């Protein structure tokens, strides 16, 4: 069990009524809470959501707060400070004064910094410190008036092969305020990508998807991501750039296995973070299994840190892998099915 969940169980006597677990890990916590606790989960991680659904735990996959009413909320601290600001805002706009909010997180995950954000809304108290985690309690004294989701957007412009794109990114989305180096290295090669049905695996704020859609109005883009905030950001990026929704297929995925088949191309700056931890499972799975989702002569385009062994993985499954460039610590890799 996740150590943060263990800390919650140690202090379960504080819980009562309808309790919303926000950003909770997919473990046995809910099943081990007392039966009188009516617990449900709000998550934006599709893999976690599927896990909760499979175990019969009431779960809500969205960027928005659930529509039900709750007596308490437990926030598992996210990696992003901006995302925590958003979560705190929506919690304080849905709960009432004198209700309880709990904040739990790992010390190395910034729980003490998060507690300082929490104290903007009332008196806080540290309830526990164990398993390299802390649990804080807030009695709500100040509630918020809900702000529209669009007010949380960060936008910036990107020049790609003579086109200017406006990128929209919600809190917690990779490279929310600027173009990351890996994608910048990949962008000049996007005009070589085969047209047709194209998947952007780990679409983030939709930079790759948006360029490919704008470059050819006949392209159909399957924007794939595990994160609801990324999918919502991609949809907003398309709208901001005047690209019709008929070119966009948004799809939450747990990995490449959930992707459509018979694709003309898969393009990716693959994800490698899960919360505060590094996890290469999704990107390694992409290298190993992308061919199953491509048509004959379909293309795989990946940008990745040069120290990763992806060329070997791709060559093993495609029979070849071409390194298009090696620049600023990143390689652009190409293979044809």
Swiss-Prot record:
Entry EC number(s): 2.1.1.172
Transmembrane annotation, as ranges: none
SUPFAM superfamilies: S-adenosyl-L-methionine-dependent methyltransferases (SSF53335)
Catalyzed reactions: guanosine(1207) in 16S rRNA + S-adenosyl-L-methionine = N(2)-methylguanosine(1207) in 16S rRNA + S-adenosyl-L-homocysteine + H(+)
Subcellular location(s) of the protein: Cytoplasm
Cellular-component GO terms for this entry: cytoplasm
Keywords linked to the UniProt accession: Cytoplasm, Methyltransferase, rRNA processing, S-adenosyl-L-methionine, Transferase
GO-annotated molecular function: 16S rRNA (guanine(1207)-N(2))-methyltransferase activity; nucleic acid binding
PANTHER family reported in the protein's UniProt record: RIBOSOMAL RNA SMALL SUBUNIT METHYLTRANSFERASE C (PTHR47816:SF4)
Subunit structure: Monomer.
UniProt function note: Specifically methylates the guanine in position 1207 of 16S rRNA in the 30S particle.
Family: Belongs to the methyltransferase superfamily. RsmC family.
Annotated protein name in UniProt: Ribosomal RNA small subunit methyltransferase C
Organism encoding this protein: Acinetobacter baumannii (strain AYE)
Gene field: rsmC
